[in-house]
């Protein structure tokens, strides 16, 4: 049996290979499996990294779907939005779990080309705005109860 970390690596590589072959549907399956990996012995940081990597795969899948000439235009548009919205949702989930408390992770995300397909989306812009606002706010002091 493989460890959850090994499974995560394999799912990420499989998703990337599927994208290289323009198979966005299979890449999305890998991304969803990656996002859903859970293990009681894994650190939450690893699980958050899985969700971040899944968001990257979904973002890239949205770009691949946009170029899929075999799909009708309406279906193509719907898939692009579905994949991209799911990618943003995973990033928001990661933020709520504390993944972006590390400024290095925020800096990486801001320049990560895997997320370029999301950058013009309103929900992604809102996510960035909220992330930057929370980064400038000091942690709330503990209450004296």
Question: Where are the predicted features?
Answer:
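Alpha-helical protein-protein interaction modules
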Residues: 1-145
């Amino acid at each position: 049996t493989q460890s959850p970390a090994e499974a995560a690596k394999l799912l990420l590589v499989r998703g990337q290979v599927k994208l290289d072959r323009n198979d966005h549907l299979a890449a999305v399956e890998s991304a969803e499996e990656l996002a859903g990996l859970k293990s009681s012995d894994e650190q939450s940081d690893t699980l958050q990294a899985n969700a971040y990597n899944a968001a990257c795969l979904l973002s890239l899948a949205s770009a691949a779907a946009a170029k899929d000439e075999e799909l009708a235009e309406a279906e193509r548009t719907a898939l692009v939005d579905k994949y991209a919205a799911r990618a943003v949702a995973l990033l928001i989930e990661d933020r709520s779990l504390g993944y972006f408390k590390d400024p290095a992770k925020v800096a990486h995300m801001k320049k990560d080309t895997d997320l370029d397909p999301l950058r013009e989306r309103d929900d992604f812009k809102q996510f960035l705005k909220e992330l930057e606002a929370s980064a400038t706010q000091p942690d709330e002091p503990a209450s004296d109860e």
